[in-house]
């Protein structure tokens, strides 16, 4: 087994055996977001600007952490109930590489614009695949996003990246008929799977968190 996979296997096993995982599944209506992305263009050249949906999700998730700070924490001592509240917003991105799974961080997402986040996502993904990324980029995260959108599938149970307390799984978006104002409309929906540490996050808080995240996704306020 390659070294990266050995390290990942050990870390994932520890997380699964340590944290009581619960996964909350939902779907977000991203019709407006996809329409907005399709219309993005350079104001000077008029050329289309391609921004991955993951950049919007990372930004929306950061807003979520501000509203629900428990998700931006770590449980340091179970017996004493010591919880460390993080003051930064570093989003981990699970990257599938030929060497195994890597989770580099996009740091200070709250201070960056969508375009910056999108460019940084491409950069850290490429560095990870080429084994050129600094090891320090794998530590100090707030929460992790893992996306299977480019591969397929809908809902799954992502394993929390310990010592974080939650991870957001993203499936492949698809068209769905939704009944809105007395008629069915074709909408684009995104499957969401949020795994969380049930020792410090309860089901109601997780449900509120997911609802808030997908409510902020379709708006331009996060740009």
Model-derived features: where do they sit?
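Single conserved hydrophobic/aromatic residue that forms the stacking wall/gate
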Residues: 214, 219-223
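C-terminal catalytic/motor cores of large multi-domain enzyme assemblies
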Residues: 1-215
């Amino acid at each position: 087994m390659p070294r990266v996979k050995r390290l990942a296997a050990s870390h994932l096993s520890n997380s699964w055996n340590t944290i009581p995982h619960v996964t909350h599944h939902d779907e977000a209506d991203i019709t407006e977001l996809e329409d907005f992305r399709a219309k993005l263009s350079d104001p000077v050249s008029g050329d289309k600007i391609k921004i991955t949906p993951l950049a919007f999700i990372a930004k929306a998730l950061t807003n979520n952490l501000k509203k629900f700070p428990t998700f931006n924490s770590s449980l340091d001592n179970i017996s004493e109930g010591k919880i460390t509240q993080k003051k930064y917003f570093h989003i981990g991105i699970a990257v599938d590489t030929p060497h195994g799974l890597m989770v580099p961080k996009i740091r200070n997402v709250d201070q960056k614009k969508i375009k910056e986040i999108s460019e940084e996502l491409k950069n850290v993904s490429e560095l990870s695949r080429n084994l050129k990324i600094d090891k320090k980029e794998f530590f100090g995260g707030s929460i992790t996003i893992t996306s299977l959108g480019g591969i397929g599938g809908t809902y799954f149970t992502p394993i929390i990246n310990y010592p974080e307390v939650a991870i957001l799984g993203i499936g492949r978006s698809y068209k769905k008929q939704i009944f809105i104002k007395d008629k069915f409309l074709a909408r684009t929906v995104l499957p969401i799977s949020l795994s969380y540490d049930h020792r410090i996050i309860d089901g109601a808080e997780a449900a509120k968190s997911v609802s808030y995240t997908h409510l902020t996704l379709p708006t331009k306020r996060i740009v």
